[in-house]
Amino acid sequence: MEKHIILLPGDGIGREIIDSAKQVLTAIASEYNHRFTFEEHAIGGSAIDEYGTPLPDKTVDACSKADAILLGAVGGPKWDANPSHLRPEKGLLGIRKQLGLFANLRPVKTISSLLYASPLKEEIVSQADMLIIRELTGGIYFGTPSERTTNGVVDTLQYSREEIERIVERGFEAARIRKKHLTSVDKANVLESSKLWREIVEEKSKDYPDVAVNHLLVDAAAMKLVTQPSFFDVIVTENLFGDILSDEASVLTGSLGMLPSASLRADGLGLYEPVHGSAPDIAGKGIANPLAMILSAALMLEHSFGLVDEAKEIERAVNDCLLQGFHTADIHIPGGVQVGTKQMTDAVLENVTTKSISDSICSSYV
């Protein structure tokens, strides 16, 4: 298989971790007789510095022609005082919108060898294994008007029926191939948009009689995530709620440095990135955890290229590294081997080409 991948290092630790993912993908291509080509472009703060905009036209053009996109991270205090249209985050929001990447998938699965790192008790978090599906291109982040007024401010939450239907269908499809349980999160006791959301979920449920559906208000869902995370299989929700809940859920694993994500459109084009931010405080120090970026590459192989075995090979290699005791600073414990970005990447590369030491291959993150 031959595929062309756009690399968007972005800001902070983005370049360090995206280089790690590129090395692992190159190793996988060699092992499985694929050919991956790479092309790098700017986004976020680095694009502002070089081109005067967080999302250059050449970046959008290249991404629109690619088979998939890997993004490191965007943002940093250097650009915090910029006007809103010149903030790094506008580059990420813009590329999602322009490419029509409407579905954000964030798998959250605790890893047995890292249970110590979770802030929750082991008996609460040990069975957590969920997929959060967040609508990405509608809602209050994109509604108009959004502006300051003479005496205040206005933001607008708006959704079309089509926007809700397509993300809800994605949720049902994901639940159907997992544990057949879909939780829809809304605020239907207050918001008109949520009332329509809930109506559409009920309508679509008739097409998926094999999937059990329940509805939770967003505040109740937030509580249940930390009191009974094993309750959830697939969560589907709108943009703002999904943004907050997915960040909350990411804490269950003990480190943002372990969590990948995918932003997809209907034809399979996807942008893949770690959940964590740009971590400017450790940029250039060689200590960033590359595993979320590497696991994001695994998601890319599975969802955009259909290379399930290759994706599982990466997941197995990451799992074996952890079982061997390799940990970056964010997940380090006494008795383990604390390593930096390069050493952890090298350990993954070593495990990609060796037989698993674990009793069973780790399950897919989705």
Curated annotation (Swiss-Prot):
Residues flagged as site, Important for catalysis: 141, 187
This protein's pathway: Amino-acid biosynthesis; L-leucine biosynthesis; L-leucine from 3-methyl-2-oxobutanoate: step 3/4
Protein EC: 1.1.1.85
Catalytic activity: (2R,3S)-3-isopropylmalate + NAD(+) = 4-methyl-2-oxopentanoate + CO2 + NADH
Binding sites annotated in the UniProt record for NAD(+): 76-89, 277-289
GO cellular component terms, A-Z: cytosol
UniProt cofactor note: Binds 1 Mg(2+) or Mn(2+) ion per subunit.
GO biological process: L-leucine biosynthetic process
Cross-referenced SMART domains: Iso_dh (SM01329)
Cofactor field: Mg(2+); Mn(2+)
GO molecular function: 3-isopropylmalate dehydrogenase activity; magnesium ion binding; NAD binding
EC main group: oxidoreductase
Signal peptide: none
Free-text function comment from the UniProt entry: Catalyzes the oxidation of 3-carboxy-2-hydroxy-4-methylpentanoate (3-isopropylmalate) to 3-carboxy-4-methyl-2-oxopentanoate. The product decarboxylates to 4-methyl-2 oxopentanoate.
Protein name: 3-isopropylmalate dehydrogenase
The species this protein was found in: Oceanobacillus iheyensis (strain DSM 14371 / CIP 107618 / JCM 11309 / KCTC 3954 / HTE831)
Gene encoding the protein: leuB
